[in-house]
Structure formats: structure tokens, C-alpha cells
Amino acid sequence: MAISRGDKVRVKRPESYWYNEVGKVASVDTSGIKYPVVVRFEKVNYAAYSGVDGGNNTNNFAENELEAV
């Protein structure tokens, strides 16, 4: 299951804010870290400052937590 940059993936990590959401792979780190795949999403999460629009729209995942779409 070689995931590469630009692939569309579905998140399968149940505790993630983006569980079952589809995002686009922004980068894949090959240095051996635990969560090497950076996925970018269209919507943002709840991590914004009070009164400010926005939040995070990227998150790191392990390859086994992602499913190619």
C-alpha cells in the first residue's frame, strides 16, 4: 500500500477528528517516524482561537490508518 504525495486517502483512525473524511496527501516522510504521512483536508477542525475563524486543516497519520480512495 504505497501512499504517495497527491493521493486521495480516507482516514481510518477512530479517535481522529477527520475519521472517515477524505483528504489529500501533502507529504510522506521516509525517515522512520511513527506518523509519516501528512494529510491536508478541505475543512478545518475546532483548534482555533476564540473569536477567530480557522483551525488546523492538516494532520499526521501512519500508513495503516489510511485507505486509498
UniProtKB/Swiss-Prot annotation:
GO BP terms: photosynthesis
Pfam families: PSI_PsaE
Membrane topology type: Peripheral membrane protein
Location(s) in or outside the cell: Cellular thylakoid membrane
UniProt keyword annotations, A-Z: Membrane, Photosynthesis, Photosystem I, Thylakoid
GO cellular component: photosystem I reaction center; plasma membrane-derived thylakoid membrane
Family membership noted in the UniProt record: Belongs to the PsaE family.
Function: Stabilizes the interaction between PsaC and the PSI core, assists the docking of the ferredoxin to PSI and interacts with ferredoxin-NADP oxidoreductase.
Protein name: Photosystem I reaction center subunit IV
Species this protein is from: Prochlorococcus marinus (strain MIT 9211)
